[in-house]
């Protein structure tokens, strides 16, 4: 699953060092929504990583 534009934006802002509170303020969002979007994005990244590792293992 691909990351949404919002998920990418939130991860980018976190990488720049902004807190959930600052991101929520900057994007005019509620803080629980920022946390949920970040959590969903990280889950998608972990699933994609696991898929790649599985595909790599099948090639061996």
Where do the PLM segments sit?
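Short helix-coil-helix linker/hinge
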Residues: 1-7
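Hydrophobic positions on the alpha-helical face of helix-turn-helix-like DNA-binding modules
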Residues: 10, 23-25, 34
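Short helix-to-turn junction characteristic of helix-turn-helix DNA-binding domains
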Residues: 13-18
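Helix-turn-helix DNA-binding motif, specifically the short coil turn and the N-cap/start of the second
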Residues: 19, 28-33
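Residues within the DNA-recognition helix of helix-turn-helix
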Residues: 37-40, 44
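Short, basic, alpha-helical segments at the C-terminal edge of helix-turn-helix-like DNA-binding modules
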Residues: 50-60
């Amino acid at each position: 699953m691909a990351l949404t534009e919002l998920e990418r934006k939130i991860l980018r802002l976190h990488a720049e060092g902004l807190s959930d509170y600052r991101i929520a303020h900057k994007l005019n969002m509620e803080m629980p929504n920022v946390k949920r979007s970040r959590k969903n994005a990280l889950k998608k990244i972990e699933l994609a990583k696991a898929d790649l590792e599985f595909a790599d293992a099948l090639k061996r």
